[in-house]
């Protein structure tokens, strides 16, 4: 482990096939429907680039199946790397967090499952406060990596007000509201494959790996252009 003690080790040799193997821990006593972050220190080796999701953290939410940390590939046994994943707690104040090699589903564009070796230590969970830029409207909550917020708080408030209008229009069109009528949540995430701009669910995952987030805010700041494509 980090200080010479024990840690979690998951290993899968290529000759045994790709895997999605994780160590799961159930959490209780969380505030219901609030954003939390799980941290871990990680070392890893021999994980082929873009083969599945590699070494990852994720939670077992049934409202957002695809949420995860960024994916780690290759070999890094010299230093412990920090890894984190954000997730919404369940309505009963619980969550199930997983330290894994490969993902729980194999149906992702990179196959989900992986081979190699990964070590996890110093796993902790905190409620998100200033780790993310957070703002909300009447029907939408926003959780964004601060370095990617290129618009002012006022401009984002106006954007959220427009998203609220779109929410009401969708509700009128469909005759129903998603997720039992609770506010939509939009969460920027590095745990998406390169082919995805965003993924539907609760929360909606908005890829911060490339320019999806920054370009939206740049257009908002420079031209007042606002997008509602995230409400899919």
Q: Where does each model-flagged region fall?
A:
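Juxtacatalytic substrate-recognition/specificity segment
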Residues: 136-232
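Extracellular and organelle-lumenal recognition/adhesion modules and their flexible linkers in secreted
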Residues: 1-131
């Amino acid at each position: 482990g980090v200080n010479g003690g024990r840690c979690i080790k998951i290993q899968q040799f290529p000759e045994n096939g790709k895997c999605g193997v994780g160590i799961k821990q159930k959490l209780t006593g969380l505030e219901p429907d609030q954003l939390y972050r799980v941290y871990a220190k990680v070392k890893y080796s021999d994980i082929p680039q873009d083969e599945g999701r590699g070494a990852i953290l994720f939670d077992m939410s049934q409202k957002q199946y695809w949420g995860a940390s960024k994916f780690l590939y290759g070999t890094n046994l010299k230093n412990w790397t920090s890894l984190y994943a954000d997730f919404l707690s369940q309505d009963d104040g619980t969550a199930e967090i997983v330290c894994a090699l490969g993902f729980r589903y194999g149906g992702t564009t990179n196959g989900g499952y992986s081979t190699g070796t990964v070590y996890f230590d110093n796993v902790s969970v905190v409620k998100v406060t200033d780790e993310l830029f957070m703002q909300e409207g009447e029907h939408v909550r926003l959780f964004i990596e601060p370095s990617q917020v290129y618009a002012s708080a006022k401009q984002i408030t106006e954007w959220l007000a427009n998203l609220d209008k779109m929410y009401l229009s969708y509700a009128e069109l469909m005759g129903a509201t998603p997720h039992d009528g609770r506010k939509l949540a939009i969460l920027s995430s590095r745990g998406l494959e390169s082919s995805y701009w965003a993924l539907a669910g609760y929360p909606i995952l908005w890829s911060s790996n490339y320019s999806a987030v920054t370009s939206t805010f740049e257009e908002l700041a420079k031209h007042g252009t606002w997008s509602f494509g995230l409400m899919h």
